[in-house]
């Protein structure tokens, strides 16, 4: 992290009163000493709240499930990593030697986590209103492209995007049974999601349909959707 932090502050649009908070937010767990994981936890909560509040105001007729899907798109790791790269955040990260050699400063998850940590650091440094203003400014371009049409995605896509937004492994689908004659088969599929203790299940006249039903059941089990969306 040899580049001047003042340059990063200009890119972020915020100047820290406590520079140590900023440095901590940029410190990966592979680096010796304290790291940014607690700030990341805090920043993730703030990000989800600010994005949810803004979507609630922007889409007054949207249902709960639609709002959840829009928020998942806004806060997913891919989106945050794109923002982080726009700030050249990788130039400022404090990484352990092994992580540095393996190119950790370019890794999507590390960049996204550091950006969330910076949100947490700004909150501690200046309070909620400033943190909200920065988050909304950074996400302005993403908000401009959002419509409720974005919620009309199939359950498998919605489940994948939700899991990606949480930095989780993608779901695994398995056909566990096929019943009926060749011209009239019913497929039975199980969907394994790392956040759930039990696999969700679905059935349909094709494997694709059964997977969609299983994905929809997983979304309900996760509390992302309520079955009426």
UniProtKB/Swiss-Prot annotation:
Entry GO MF terms: double-stranded RNA binding; metal ion binding; ribonuclease III activity; rRNA binding
Residue span, DRBM domain: 154-224
A GO term from the CC aspect: cytoplasm
Listed cofactors: Mg(2+)
Catalytic site positions: 44, 116
Domain RNase III as annotated: residue spans: 5-127
Annotated GO biological process: mRNA processing; regulation of gene expression; rRNA processing; tRNA processing
SMART domains referenced in this protein's UniProt entry, alphabetically: DSRM, RIBOc
Entry's EC annotation: 3.1.26.3
NCBIfam families in UniProt: RNaseIII (TIGR02191)
Family per record: Belongs to the ribonuclease III family.
Protein name: Ribonuclease 3
UniProt organism field: Pseudomonas fluorescens (strain Pf0-1)
Gene: rnc
